[in-house]
């Protein structure tokens, strides 16, 4: 649904017609990487899970917790693989990321990226509109480091191509 407000609107509309409704209201899904994984496989899985439909999927992972023993290796590979993703027309077979759905979504994503940087995160890749796209709602897939649990990005669903990295012991 994208938000509790939209979920309530959908429920009201369904109630008027006495329709059954099932919703997932902003689960803010975690992606957890323990120290016993194959980093090559898990980074491929992270890319597929996060960037499907440019991160605009309710079940897209939004919080990436990486075991401290695997952080450097995971970070290196996720950044390298993210930089190789092609942005473009979603109907082209060689495109990995199409546009965001609306100008409003793009503006909200830019505000969240700015806020995340101001809160102390470091942008490892992405973090802006692609310079070669003059039209459309395109945004580069972005990986953040030095994110803390109290940052806004950890509480608000980004609904876009953002990966915040945190570590655990």
How would you describe each model-predicted region?
Residues 33, 165-169:
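Short acidic-hydrophobic, aromatic-tinged amphipathic segments that line or gate anion-handling sites
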Residues 157-158:
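Short, surface-exposed loop/turn microsegments at beta-strand edges and helix-strand junctions
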Residues 2-148:
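ALDH superfamily catalytic-core signature
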Residues 161:
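Glycine-rich nucleotide-phosphate-binding loops and adjacent flexible coil segments
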